[in-house]
Swiss-Prot record:
This is Probable isoprenylcysteine alpha-carbonyl methylesterase ICMEL2. Its main location: endoplasmic reticulum. Its EC number is 3.1.1.n2. It catalyses: [protein]-C-terminal S-[(2E,6E)-farnesyl]-L-cysteine methyl ester + H2O = [protein]-C-terminal S-[(2E,6E)-farnesyl]-L-cysteine + methanol + H(+). The chain crosses the membrane at residues 85-105, 140-160. Substrate binds at G146, G147, A148, Q217, S218, A219. The keyword Hydrolase applies. Belongs to the AB hydrolase superfamily. Isoprenylcysteine methylesterase family. It is a multi-pass membrane protein. InterPro entries: AB_hydrolase_fold (IPR029058), BD-FAE-like_dom (IPR049492), GDXG_lipolytic_enzyme (IPR050300). GO terms for cellular component: endoplasmic reticulum membrane; Golgi membrane.
């Protein structure tokens, strides 16, 4: 089986889900996301001077450097870690020509709205990829990138954003705090807040608020699934919410893992030490809490009924997260595996 995470197949699945999907019932929500000033299909442009951009870049560079040294304290300088770092460096060098093309598009294209603020934390930013010509409200993808919970960044979704924007789909790439800046609870909270911003504000950028699809890849698939299920639990129990699960037309999980207990040994063998993984997941005792497969089995029928159709895709030759980890068993839920 070949991987099915290409922009073409995601776009096709979105169209299929849109044409055959059931009507979602709406739910009143209490908006907690700031709404952008202005309106119009093109959406408000982020007003910033060159000085502001330089200052923002400098602060992010300092933050990344500081967190890198903090991370090295966790990782140590073992042979396995160093060998994998060397392999990753060589891999990045070989892909540099492609990176340069994507980087040029990311920084200079008028279709990209970079670093839109959705919350108060330093990494609470998202990028929007807008189609050139918007004649009517566009379908929307809220994308949570992967990165082993450590190196995720919103720009990793730039190629997906570009390809889907060419097909008339608005893409919102949501950034979130990585470890050691934050743990899994912070990541899920950030992702949920980013989704809230998309649900409450995307119409101002030409998006259709009734056609929002949540997509996560690798660690991002795990984080997005946690955010979705956590929101369903809150909504079914009558808690105050800033966005409704019923606003999500479908969830697509690409190469994700949904039972953290089953992945501890695998990650350890791949170089992610158990102690580091437990620190990311807020302790071994929290693995069940952040395992979507376990949470849904313990959830009420009211919670399950709120969840949108779910499509899980995984390549059988994926060694980062084994394809067996894709099984997210949900009684009475609309789940498709590919």
């Amino acid at each position: 089986m070949r991987p099915v995470s290409s922009a073409e197949e995601v776009g096709a699945l979105l169209s299929r889900s849109d044409s055959s999907g059931r009507r979602r019932r709406s739910s009143p929500v209490q908006s907690a996301s700031p709404r952008p000033a202005g309106c119009g299909c093109g959406g408000p442009r982020r007003q910033s001077s060159f000085r502001d951009d330089v200052g923002h870049a400098a602060s992010e560079t300092y933050l990344v450097t500081r967190l890198t040294f903090s991370l090295l304290q966790y990782l140590g300088l073992g042979y396995r870690w160093m060998s994998q770092l060397l392999a990753l460096t060589i891999y990045a060098i070989l892909l540099m020509p492609g990176f340069l093309q994507v980087g040029y598009y990311y920084f200079f294209s008028s279709q990209v709205r970079r670093s839109i603020v959705y919350g108060e934390q330093p990494r609470n930013r998202l990028d929007l990829y807008i189609p050139k010509d918007i004649n009517r409200p566009c379908p929307v993808v809220a994308f949570v990138t992967g990165g082993a919970w450590i190196i995720g960044y919103k720009a990793w979704g730039s190629l997906l954003g570009r390809r889907l924007a060419e097909r008339g789909i608005i893409v919102a790439c949501i950034d979130y705090r990585n470890f050691p800046q934050g743990t899994i609870g912070d990541m899920v909270s950030d992702a949920s807040q980013g989704i809230s911003y998309v649900c409450n504000n995307i119409a101002s950028y030409g998006g259709d608020p009734n056609r929002i699809y949540l997509v996560g890849q690798s660690a991002g698939a795990h984080i997005a699934a946690c955010a979705l299920i956590e929101q369903a639990v809150k909504e079914s129990s009558g808690q105050s919410i800033s966005w409704s699960v019923t606003q999500i037309k479908a969830y697509f999980g690409l190469s994700g893992g949904y039972n953290m207990h089953s992945l501890v040994d695998h990650f350890h063998e791949r170089g992610l030490n158990r102690s580091i993984f437990f620190s990311i997941m807020e302790g071994e005792e929290s693995l069940s809490r952040y395992s979507p497969e376990i949470v849904v089995k313990q959830s009420s029928s009211q919670t399950i009924a709120l969840l949108p159709p779910i499509v899980l895709m995984h390549g059988t030759e994926d060694y980062s997260i084994p394809s067996s980890a894709r099984f997210l068993l949900m009684p009475s839920a609309d789940v498709h595996l590919r």
